[in-house]
UniProtKB/Swiss-Prot annotation:
Protein's recorded name: Methionine--tRNA ligase
Annotated compartments: Cytoplasm
Pfam families attached to this UniProt entry: Anticodon_3 (PF19303), tRNA-synt_1g (PF09334), tRNA_bind (PF01588)
Role according to the record: Is required not only for elongation of protein synthesis but also for the initiation of all mRNA translation through initiator tRNA(fMet) aminoacylation.
'KMSKS' region, short sequence motif: residues: 345-349
GO molecular function: ATP binding; metal ion binding; methionine-tRNA ligase activity; tRNA binding
Gene name as annotated: metG
Catalytic activity annotation: tRNA(Met) + L-methionine + ATP = L-methionyl-tRNA(Met) + AMP + diphosphate
Binding positions for ATP per the UniProt entry: K348
Alphabetic keyword roster: Aminoacyl-tRNA synthetase, ATP-binding, Cytoplasm, Ligase, Metal-binding, Nucleotide-binding, Protein biosynthesis, RNA-binding, tRNA-binding, Zinc
């Protein structure tokens, strides 16, 4: 029975370019949609730009245009980039739409009627110059824990501490530079802590859908269990769903000057995009996919592809909103990890913060990236590392050396010797290939989004096809008298196997598959076309080169095109009463500020005595485990062995949170030796207790990007003291 599925991807924010990190999730979603359609399932695939919020309003103001003009322009840019990478949405909408306003107001009204909305007075920082309340990320100042300057209002990027904006020292508005003042405002809250919501979410996050599949991957379900707690516990906080004017968004009905927070109407944008698409087509019953009762009776599915950074919103707030407003809840959340490049966080200084547009402008084939991302995807929340040398090797070996090579070695003989017409296929070869396919379970791997396993099995089949060609040597048969019939069979069989490989690769490489369909003069391939030998007498077209090899110089040019200079300005200290820069977050400006600070402090730092130095207990530490910290942009959780043991004599590693995520992939750290401060007082952080500090080097003047953890010389052992 055909499945009926509504698939969405997370809505990109209309305040910046699409980059390769974004594309991980969109490519994963597009592959799954293409596979489902090839299997004969009915799939509607929609997305939209997320267009509301303070950053949109301020960026438009800076550019001297209206927010509407900004989001219209970015909408075109985003859709262009997705199209260039083969992400084939049926419709790409905007959250700033009539459909989204109607849905947001309706859902809010139903939640209000069900007792899930309440108002409270809260105290917030207010910018007296811009006459606006400031979101946490638009307040900056000195960290209350370590004293680092130029830190955001919710967490410190230097020491990793989390705090309230009111705890910042010397706070200032990142919008105007003015000193903010505290003001009280009435806000609207969605009561996520309501026992009805807690009970529902505890069941929903741990349960299965109608098809018997878990709604959440195991890692996501475990995270929900941590956030929800056990039965009888209530760890959830209510959710502030309102913002004060001025704000770019939808005004809350009956609340002048109050607007829906962007995260309320953003996921509702899935429904709005689908409604616009359905009404434009005229043959889709929207309620069959959105209404709780009708969705159940019609057996429709709602599948969201999202990044793990927005799991909290999609696995808690979103299903609870839908449930208690009478809408269907998601069938499944497909959560992907972050992208690293060559084992490190994307970096503008290294040129690895690569935009989708620059990749296309530099002339690189987008299907190289689609293939590589698919090869690294396994259906879990693990991060994907784009190892550029590995991508070159994998594309050149798998796609050019194995797959395309089959057609390039055989097509010419069909054209020259047999007037472009195929002969009979070798029944034994095709039967052996079919048997190998059935054991590979490629379709199951695609359905489970384990694309890496699917591609490994497809390349194993490509090896079998190449082995068939190598064993029968058509280039030698062509030179031998009386072997034309055998040559015809061998080349025709090879092209039938090539057709099947193309079919299996089509969800990942739709553009290349279209070229092959044209070359073999075939209609669009469907999954059940496999094992139907191309008939004798079938005419194919002239072979055209299908894919070029990746050259290292192309990758180097791409990195150079994306490299942002971090050269600092002249080393002059800012005036004591100078206002901070208006725009926050620039790497260039951050480097300049760090350089200014260094210029002042290098000669002014007081000397310390040897006694002061010996108070610091520096130890050699072995990194026995390293993990990403969910919800932290900068931190890695380390387990460090410094020779300590528990009462039973077993190793007792220390837990330390280190702000080195921008420079290191956790997997590359395990087993390394480094240096830590062992007698630093334990500090309770948002993510757990930190029992020390790892030492790392960085360039104080900002000329060289990066962080570098210290490593001892050969022979040092865990627990040794550094003197």
């Amino acid at each position: 029975m055909s499945r009926k599925i509504l698939v969405t991807n997370a809505l990109p924010y209309a305040n910046g370019d699409i980059h390769l990190g974004h594309l991980v999730g969109y490519i994963q979603g597009d592959i799954w949609v293409r596979f489902q359609r090839m299997r004969g399932n009915s799939v509607h695939y929609v997305c939209a730009d997320d267009t509301h919020g303070t950053p949109i309003m301020l960026r438009a103001e800076k550019e001297g245009i209206t927010p509407e003009q900004l989001i219209d322009r970015v909408h075109g840019e985003h859709l262009r980039d997705f199209t260039d990478f083969g992400v084939g949405f049926d419709h790409y909408h905007s959250t700033h739409s009539a459909e989204n306003r109607a849905y947001a107001e309706e859902i809010y009204g139903k939640l209000l009627g069900a007792g899930f909305i309440e108002t409270r007075s809260i105290e917030q920082f207010y910018d007296p110059v811009k006459e606006m309340f400031l979101p946490d990320r638009f307040i900056k100042g000195e960290c209350p824990k370590c004293g680092a300057g130029d830190q955001y209002g919710d967490n410190c990027e230097v020491c990793g501490a989390a705090y309230a904006p009111t705890e910042l020292k010397n706070p200032y508005s990142a919008v105007s530079g003015a000193k903010p003042v505290l003001r009280t405002s009435e806000h609207y809250f969605f009561r996520l802590s309501d026992p009805r919501a807690v009970e529902f979410l505890r069941d929903w996050t741990r349960g299965t859908n109608a098809g018997g599949e878990r709604r959440l991957q195991a890692e996501a379900a475990n995270k929900m269990k941590e956030w929800l707690g056990e039965a009888g516990e209530n760890k959830l906080s209510d959710w502030d769903i309102s913002r004060d004017a001025p704000y770019f968004g939808f005004e809350i009905p009956g609340a002048p000057g109050k607007y829906f927070y962007v995260w309320l109407d953003a996921p509702i944008g899935y429904l709005a995009s689908f409604r616009h698409y359905a009404e434009r087509r005229g043959d889709i019953a929207v309620a069959d996919y959105t209404d709780a009762a009708r969705a159940e009776s019609h057996g429709t599915e709602l599948v969201h592809f999202i990044g793990k950074d927005i799991l909290y919103f999609h696995a808690l707030f979103w299903p609870a909103m839908l449930k208690f407003a009478g809408y269907r809840t998601p069938t499944q959340l497909c959560v992907n990890g972050f992208l690293t490049v060559d084992g490190a966080k994307m970096s503008k200084s290294r040129g690895t913060f690569i935009t989708a547009r620059s990749y296309i402008v530099q002339g690189l084939n987008p299907e190289w990236l689609r293939y590589y991302f698919a090869s690294k995807s396994n259906g879990t929340m693990e991060d994907v590392d784009l190892n550029l040398d590995d991508m070159i090797a994998k594309v050149n070996s798998d796609l050019v050396g194995k797959y395309v090579n089959i057609a390039s070695r055989c097509a010419g003989f069909i054209a020259k010797r047999f007037d472009g017409k195929l002969g009979a296929s070798d029944p034994k070869a095709t039967a052996d290939f079919e048997s190998a396919y059935e054991s590979a379970q490629i379709a199951q791997a695609y359905d489970e989004r384990d694309y890496g396993r699917a591609l490994r099995e497809i390349m194993r089949l490509a090896d079998l096809a190449n082995q068939y060609v190598n064993d029968h040597k058509p280039w030698e048969l062509a030179k031998q008298d009386g072997q034309d019939a055998q040559l015809h069979v061998v080349c025709s069989t090879a092209l039938t196997l090539f057709r099947d490989l193309t079919l299996y690769l089509k969800p990942v490489l739709p553009g290349l598959a279209a070229k092959v369909e044209a070359f073999l003069a075939l209609p669009p391939l469907q999954w059940n076309d496999s094992w139907k030998p191309l008939p004798a007498g079938h005419a194919i077209t002239a072979y055209q080169h299908l894919m070029t090899r990746v050259e290292r110089k192309q990758i180097d040019a791409l990195l150079e095109a994306n490299r942002e200079s971090l050269a600092p300005a002249a080393a002059t200290a800012p005036a004591k009463d100078a206002k901070p820069a208006k725009e926050a977050g620039s790497q260039q400006r951050h480097a300049e500020k760090q350089q200014h600070a260094a210029g002042v402090s290098e000669t002014a730092s007081p000397h310390i005595s040897i006694d002061d130095f010996t108070k610091v207990d520096l130890r050699i530490a072995k990194i026995v485990d390293a993990q990403h910290v969910e919800g932290a942009d900068k931190l890695i959780r380390l387990q460090l062995d410094i020779g300590e043991t528990d009462e039973a004599g077993n190793p007792k590693p220390r837990q330390v949170f280190a702000g080195i995520k921008s420079a290191y992939d956790p997997a590359t750290l395990v087993g390394r030796l480094t240096v830590m401060v062992a007698n630093l007082a334990p500090r309770k952080m948002k993510f757990g207790m930190s029992e020390g500090m790892v030492l790392a080097a960085s360039d104080p003047d900002g000329k060289t990007g990066g962080l570098y953890i210290l490593a001892p010389d050969e022979g040092a052992q865990a627990g040794m003291r550094v003197k």
